[in-house]
Amino acid sequence: MNLFPAIDLRGGKVVRLTQGDYDRMTVYGEDPCAQARQFVEAGARYLHVVDLDGAKDGTLSNYRSIAALAEQGGLYIEVGGGIRTEERIEKYLSLDVDRCILGSVAVTDFDFTARMLKRYGERIAVGVDAKDGFVAIHGWKEVSAEKGVDFCRRLADAGCTA
């Protein structure tokens, strides 16, 4: 089993939202790299990073923080949050981020997701949230008509392994 400690970024800070509510945010630190070093010192080899600003409004306001995390090395880094275009995927992969995570776009544009899975293979993962067994998107604000299990089968058929 591989454990991925997580860093959620908002405005360049390490934060956690309460039940996904941007109005109920706790700041845990000003320096994401310092947090990552603490994870490494505790034995971590992997890191899950979520760009909450990107997820909410599609901006790249945390790009410098993510670049700094990738530059310090020592961790396998996966990034999610607001990745909706191939340009964004390329931008993150060019930083030596190891994997990009697609979220809501996997549901809203499955053809795009299938193309990215084919083009980038294991460098693409898909995050699937489910509520009452059905796929939830856009920060749990919408629930699709598709069951999570069925959606995951379609993803596997499209080549998704993570």
Residue ranges and their predicted role:
Residues 35-50, 95, 157-162:
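Catalytic domains of carbohydrate-active enzymes, especially glycoside hydrolases
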Residues 28-40, 84-90, 143-155:
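Short, acidic/polar
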Residues 46-64, 104:
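Glycine-rich, proline-tolerant flexible connector loops at the mouths of alpha/beta enzymes
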Residues 3-9, 47-49, 75-81, 100-102, ...:
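Hydrophobic faces of well-ordered beta-strands that scaffold small-molecule active sites
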Residues 19-23, 90-93, 97-162:
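Conserved anion-binding
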Residues 9-11, 51-54, 83-85, 106, ...:
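Active-site-proximal loop/turn and secondary-structure-junction residues that shape catalytic pockets
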Residues 57-80, 113-129:
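Alpha-helix-loop-beta-strand connector modules within alpha/beta enzyme cores
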Residues 1-19, 131:
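N-terminal amphipathic alpha-helix/helix-capping segment at the start of soluble metabolic enzymes
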